Structure formats: structure tokens, C-alpha cells
Amino acid sequence: MIKKIFIGLSILPLIALSGTASTRLDKELSDITLVSSIDTVSEENSAPIKVEPTWKCLDCSPNEQYVLKKLQEYTKINDRNALATIMGNIKSESNFRANICEGGARVSYTECRSGGFGLIQWTSIGRYRGLGNFCTKYQCDPSSLEGQVRWMVNEPIFQRVLPEFEGHGDTIPQYMSHAYYWLGWGIKGYREQYAYDYSKKMVLT
């Protein structure tokens, strides 16, 4: 006589057996039940997932918070002074506006005819075209905050100085020297003061 048993959604034919064969089949079925029970983990016996704390700026604008978050996701920078220095320089260059041309005009990537453009005011032909070429290749919008942050952390000149930012223990003035190599600003302005301001507002959570 043939019986049928249900395991999940599968239907398996079962031939009535006796002796050793029946014992072996019983064990195989019990093993299947055991595996199924392992797949379901209750809250009581589950292992906690370790979540690394990150720096946040609760009083910052949405654009500032996005950039701070992505800097930590896309790189290994976890030093507060390093992050604050990068943030201070971006504030000085664009005030975290992606669609801004040098002089203050709010335009798209293709409409900025002269001077710098975007978050860090990409100015030279090579760096400006690099943004466009990157977004063409990786399907992002060169006028958007998201696209520019992706290019910013992947740009070769930033990659060369990245190990300095990923180190630990430097002061903001020391990190500013690395930022100068990255950006090469003409006027220093308030960028260092902005960096100090960010360092005071950032919290590790």
C-alpha cells in the first residue's frame, strides 16, 4: 500500500517498509524536520548583530547628513576630525548644493559654462569631465547630490589622499593640509572654522 506525506509544499510517495529500512527512513525524516527547525530562529536564541557606531550630525541639514553618512559608508574614514575637515571644506565650496555653478548660479551640470561646479566646485576640464564621464559609465546624475558624492570619493585625486583621512589622531589643521592637496583652494576662507564647528556637532551613535 502506498501512503503520502507532506513536507512543506512537497509530496513524497512512501512505501510501507519494515525492519532496518523503516528505521533508516524514520531517521531521514527526522533529520529533515531538524534542518527545518534550524531555519527558524526565535528572538530568545538569536545571536545579536553587531552594528558599528557612526558619526552623525543631528543639527545638520539633510544634504549634510547624507554626505556624512555616505563618507562613512564608501570609505573607512571614522575619525571625527577627518570627517569634520572634509565637511567643512564642502561647506566652503558649495554649502552642500550640488547644482551650483561658481558665482552662485543654480544650474545643471551641462549648463555651467565657466568656473567650478558642484559640491567641491570641480573646475579644471579634466575634473569637470571626470564627473560627467563617471556618471555616464555608472548611470548616475552628475547634477545630483548622490551622483556627485559617488564621484567625489572615487575621483583619483581623492583616492590618493584617502589613506591620510583614514588614519587616526590628526588635528584639524593637519587634516586641512591633506584637504589642500585634494582641493587646491585659492582662498582658504572659513573652511577650517567650519571644520571645527562640525567636530563639535558630530556625535557617535
Kindly give the residue locations of the regions a language model identified:
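Short, flexible beta-strand-to-coil junctions
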Residues: 1-3, 91-92
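Non-catalytic cell-wall polysaccharide-engagement segments
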Residues: 2-39, 128-205
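Sparse, context-dependent recognition of short Cys/His-centered cofactor- or disulfide-binding micro-motifs
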Residues: 5, 81, 107
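Solvent-exposed, polar/charged alpha-helical surfaces in well-ordered, non-transmembrane soluble domains
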Residues: 65-69, 73, 84-87, 150, ...
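Hydrophobic alpha-helical context, especially transmembrane and signal-peptide helices
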Residues: 76-80, 109, 175-180
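Short, functionally critical alpha-helical segments immediately adjacent to catalytic or ligand/cofactor-binding
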Residues: 80-97
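N-terminal leader/targeting peptides and immediately adjacent processing regions
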Residues: 26-83
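Peptidoglycan-targeting cell-wall enzymes and recognition modules
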Residues: 45-67, 94-169
